[in-house]
Amino acid sequence: MPIIKVRENEPFDVALRRFKRSCEKAGILADVRAREFYEKPTTARKRAKAAAIKRLAKKLSRENARRVRLY
């Protein structure tokens, strides 16, 4: 759990913004959203595999674009 110390004479909205940023860095909201509903193991594997394919396609696309620019 991210903890922030409110500084002296610090406005509330600034402290809240720092807290939100620390929560975002810790990945709390993403974790809560992922665990909000039960996901069957087969669905989780399917989603992970699709994400891996998408990452690979993105990487290959970037490499091909780099090669084209070099010539």
Swiss-Prot record:
* Cysteine pairs bridged by disulfides in the record: none
GO aspect biological process, one term: translation
Q: Which GO terms describe its cellular component?
A: ribonucleoprotein complex; ribosome
Superkingdom classification of source:
Bacteria
Q: Does the keyword rRNA processing apply?
A: no
Mind listing the UniProt keywords for this protein, alphabetically? Ribonucleoprotein, Ribosomal protein
Q: Per the database entry, which stretches of residues form a coiled coil? A: none
The protein's name is Small ribosomal subunit protein bS21
Q: Which family does it belong to?
A: Belongs to the bacterial ribosomal protein bS21 family.
| An example molecular function term from Gene Ontology annotations | structural constituent of ribosome
Taxonomic lineage is: Bacteria, Pseudomonadati, Pseudomonadota, Gammaproteobacteria, Alteromonadales
Looking up PANTHER family in the UniProt record yields: MITOCHONDRIAL 28S RIBOSOMAL PROTEIN S21 (PTHR21109), SMALL RIBOSOMAL SUBUNIT PROTEIN BS21 (PTHR21109:SF22)
Q: Which InterPro entries match?
A: Ribosomal_bS21, Ribosomal_bS21_CS, Ribosomal_bS21_sf
| Gene this chain is encoded by | rpsU
